[in-house]
Amino acid sequence: MPGKWIFALLLLQISFCLRSAKCGKVLVWPMEFSHWMNIKTILDELVQRGHEVTVLKPSAYYVLDPKKSPDLKFETFPTSVSKDELEKYFIKLADAWTYELQRDTCLSFSPLLQNMMDEFSDYYLSVCKDAVSNKQLMAKLQESKFDVLLSDPVAACGELIAEVLHIPFLYSLRASPGHKIEKSSGRFILPPSYVPVILSGLGGQMTFIDRVKNMICMLYFDFWFHMFNAKNWDPFYTEILGRPTTLAETMGKAEMWLIRSYWDLEFPHPTLPNVDYIGGLQCKPAKPLPKDIEDFVQSSGEHGVVVFSLGSMVSSMTEEKANAIAWALAQIPQKVLWKFDGKIPATLGPNTRVYKWLPQNDLLGHPKTKAFVTHGGANGVYEAIYHGIPMIGIPMFGEQHDNIAHMVAKGAAVTLNIRTMSKSDLFNALKEVINNPFYKKNAMWLSTIHHDQPMKPLDKAIFWIEYVMRHKRAKHLRPLGHNLPWYQYHSLDVIGFLLACLAVIAALAVKCFLFIYRFFAKKQKKMKNE
């Protein structure tokens, strides 16, 4: 019997290979945390379709665990950065962003945010140098003859490895700070008059003041903020590739940009042929819950349950804040499942159970779930959209503020500030979202939009990866604007030329006028003298 199953799986993989022309070899340069969870969903599907997937794993990565992905091949290489260093940095980043970073305007981010990003840049440059300078690793990759590389541009270096190996590469990306990478390297069209800048915390139709804030954010990220220190990265890329180049220019050679978002979360804006939206690719129908959790959910009766999770990256929550949250949860008639890894609050009510881990997707897909209290991570937001669950957003850091702002603008959530939130604020927010049908209606509307696509998000991602492998590249989809320097892209040379022409014409017109004036003035004077 097992032999029959193995044979059936082999036939299934062969059928996928025939359908996609051939089975390819995919190299992956990943990022940690939720970035890895998203890209792993794509990789698992590629393996199911018969492709060979190899993941480059820096030894400093501490979340990415090869043991949990037996179907994937891993090439682990040593790094000068240790796991402890990287873990401490990300904890510091998350805590500083959550509790210290001012959010009045984007200008208030500086210099704290810039300092943190400089440290981020230094860590990843070190990891990149360790990979590219590892002759044994690079020789092995050359011999493997990969067809394509899949990377997350938030962790730069994948594009450099692809260039060294002379293979095409694609990006999988949620968003970069201020859309900096998308605009400078992808030539995305994102007018600040109606497209909220990532990390602005804005959403929906903007007022005049909102547009002023949005413009300040755009200018800040375009001219002052640097996610990667170009002074270090550009010379390194130039040295390795043996020609003058920059990090931004190399990133711009991506064949496709697979953006982990969609119009259920985003607001409409112009897009490009080599960009597709795959938000919610990790979402799937709910599976049965473990018996103990199912029994607790069923005990809620007609009131239902609330799912509470603020993610896994925030390491510290004060005892006072935890008690305030527990008190608010204890006041509602719903049962509550709270993902929490701290000291059990003294005010925890009998209706609330605390778990270190929850089957979040399966809970959100349960018919008794009434609301989701979330930090606003894209994965959790998309699972809520997928299942049509309204949200109470308590954003912590990164684009979480933007995700929740978008959900608020679309009428599927309310938002609270983790720093100023009182127990009554949370209690009132829970009552509002659970009892007001407005939020459930809009959440279901977003769910309908998400499900009503010509192709599932995961299938779109696989299609484009296989498309690039079939055609070797996708240059015919890349806008010619990639070949232009910034001043030509914005037509500044043409504008300058036209202004110069106008200036010359104006000068000639003035000279002609003066010549005619003087001619007639002299003639009139001569006539008077006669």
UniProtKB/Swiss-Prot annotation:
A GO MF term: glucuronosyltransferase activity
Top EC group: transferase
Primary location group: membrane
Cited InterPro entries: UDP-glycosyltransferase, UDP_glucos_trans, UDP_glycos_trans_CS
Annotated signal sequence range: 1-23
Pfam family, one: UDPGT
Catalytic activity: glucuronate acceptor + UDP-alpha-D-glucuronate = acceptor beta-D-glucuronoside + UDP + H(+)
Sequence intervals crossing the membrane: 494-510
Enzyme Commission number(s): 2.4.1.17
Membrane topology per record: Single-pass membrane protein
SUPFAM superfamilies: UDP-Glycosyltransferase/glycogen phosphorylase (SSF53756)
Compartments where located: Microsome membrane; Endoplasmic reticulum membrane
A cellular component annotation (GO) from this entry: endoplasmic reticulum membrane
Keywords from the UniProt entry: Endoplasmic reticulum, Glycosyltransferase, Membrane, Microsome, Signal, Transferase, Transmembrane, Transmembrane helix
Induction description: Constitutively expressed.
The protein's role, per its UniProt record: UDPGT is of major importance in the conjugation and subsequent elimination of potentially toxic xenobiotics and endogenous compounds. About 30-fold less active than Ugt2b17 toward testosterone and dihydrotestosterone.
Protein family according to the UniProt entry: Belongs to the UDP-glycosyltransferase family.
Protein name as annotated: UDP-glucuronosyltransferase 2B37
Organism for this UniProt entry: Rattus norvegicus (Rat)
